[in-house]
Amino acid sequence: MIDMAVTVDNPVSKVYSIWSSEIEKKVGKGNYSMSQSGTLASNKTKYARIFMMGNPTRDGDLEGNECSTIPAFQVDSFAKGTKALSEVYAIDDVSHKAMVSMGFRRSYGPELLENSDSTIKRVVSRYSRVYTGYLPDETK
């Protein structure tokens, strides 16, 4: 009998579920996604998106089992209209708290970046953490 190598499950669905439940309270239903499309935010006054940048193996054992990975995510926050600058940072703050609650640390940002539509303010933050298959408060 051949033992199958154990791998750490990709956390993208868990992270998106927790992040989206928090961010929806700030930006509204349907104003967030996992899409990297640059046009989704153009017709909205508040919008946020998250996407995985990678999930490389961090540790493995001699049998080939994957013991931990380092998932990395980017979160883009968008706001348009009056007080867009303060609003975009408020969206980023809600997102940041959701990511930190899952054990992620901000590795970049929050940085205000130029957007193709100058009426839309955009803030980018990136996060990573060591992941062993469980987020905080999950049972093994």
Residue ranges and their predicted role:
Residues 1-61:
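Small/polar-rich, solvent-exposed N-terminal microdomains that initiate assembly or binding
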Residues 14, 18, 90-97:
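Long, highly charged amphipathic alpha-helices
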Residues 42-44, 65-69, 117-121:
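A generic structural micro-feature
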Residues 64-68, 90-93, 139-140:
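Short intrinsically disordered coil segments
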Residues 67-81, 121-132:
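Oligomerization/assembly interface segments of phage tail-like spikes and tubes
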Residues 82-90, 136:
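Short, conserved charged micro-motifs
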Residues 93-140:
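Acidic-leaning, charged glycine-interspersed low-complexity segments
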